[in-house]
């Protein structure tokens, strides 16, 4: 029988408003059974050999040599001696290195991070610890302070080991190995929260030995730009690989543990993106979700575990999964609560907050795709392997904004038999490349030395940077602050690399005439049209009085990558603000935040919060297929994201925020565009916002606009904090009023 003949489209729990319910064979409903206590056979041998044959992703060291950054703290350097042999205790040395990196930091969380004010004195602000290859034994938790990044390097990643039966990890109380923390000046140390920015673990491995049942490899957390990237976590018989979550978890493999990730709502209620990750051999579930974790999961594989995802009782979830693979998941891919069973489910907003999307996924040796815990209803997948073209649970609004608009709730499944390795590999193939090899990097500081110049001292550094990018393909920018009086223009193949965007700033000269004319916008950093670039690890600050300034003009073509980039953090506000919050003492003038003109590629972990710009992300005149992962745009007066004449763009994990005085700001505006996807979005309005807005996403003269999943329900001043509608056609005035939905498709 052909695969097309095996295709099944199924909808459970009826349809409303013109939708037709289908139930075509193959959709089984059975009593719920307990999860298997023994994981399905995990492909351990294949993993030991580098990965199963269906996996195209290389997991190895992303920094094979030491990055040439003199401002970073070197573990093993003077004052931070280590054993590095897996025998001696290196805990104290690593803690001291983290403390020193934090002390060196150039950004104070009580200044331009928390409030947006520029006049607070600097304090512990963050930095980088570089860790060479080796095996480092730890005997207790290591706090990763706000805006500190621990970055490994070498042909083999450094490995941090919690030895067998380490005291303190078998007491019945969970205990961390690495803990993301916030340490404000003069305040108490706490776990990372919504005032924590830029912390990270990058390019290192963590191994938990036997006899540590309460160990957690990483207690993650933070508000923006926080990062777990290029990690292998061997959790063994420990409690969890990762507990709590923040912005981006990228190229992370977790083996073993009771659960791989114990997920919560990230700080301030944002989503978390899991990108190119692998979970294998968890005893209970790969991902256990508590209070609406809002996960966006892309190109991630789950192997040899009873459940890929499970929700805590009485909790709704916003779960979006795309281009992922399930191998030997023995109980069910996703275990969710029945929406009708949720406390308060008589409220449509609460019931519809329970959302699942599986899109473009594959499965082998995995029978059930969805289990609804209270009713026991199971949605079966094709055997022995199959394609999950689309499976949703929740409200679907199809043919939206037109005369054929329809609504239905429940389970919808479109699956087909057969998932050959070639198809699995194609789905998992990444578009987010690792950084260029370190041996190809040329430090801009070395170019300055060749020119007899000093940079980062408050004078104009533009000619040194321009010489560096003109002469070299990959230019490294050390930690520091660098002043420009005009645009730094990259060549067709330039890469510009930093290690930490909160500690590596390119700054516009305040009040300079080159950035003064709003009718002739001029960028601080610009890429040429159609080029191929990697730009990462940088902060872009257009100062204060630069009415024509643009933080970044991105015209790069397919295959380009913009990642781990931030603008200055300032919030728009009116002149008559009564608040004493220092965040509203700053007044600026800027044109755009990030301006994409004819370009695209891939973007990840980007934070555009220059609130005095007209918008945070303006995309114009492009049909370059582009995916954006975990992009945050906040605090502007009237527009956050604007798309004009754009095709083939996908936003996976878009977050916007309207603050107290920014209540007139629209989340997304789309004009004369087509084939746009917004998936797993959090279009947020703070509890103190001072007025309503009629809709979140406005479209005009556009086709095939798709919204998949959205957090819209707020129980605090809902007349202001909830959008008047999710989607509006600004030409006809027609709207889709539901702000909680699994699918809206025009």
Question: Which residue ranges define each predicted feature?
Answer:
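Extended hydrophobic/aromatic segments used for targeting, binding, or gating
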Residues: 652-672
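Extracellular "leader-to-stem" segments immediately downstream of a signal peptide or signal-anchor
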Residues: 2-128, 143, 149, 153-209, ...
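Long, structured stretches of catalytic cores involved in phosphate-ester chemistry, encompassing
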Residues: 626, 669-680
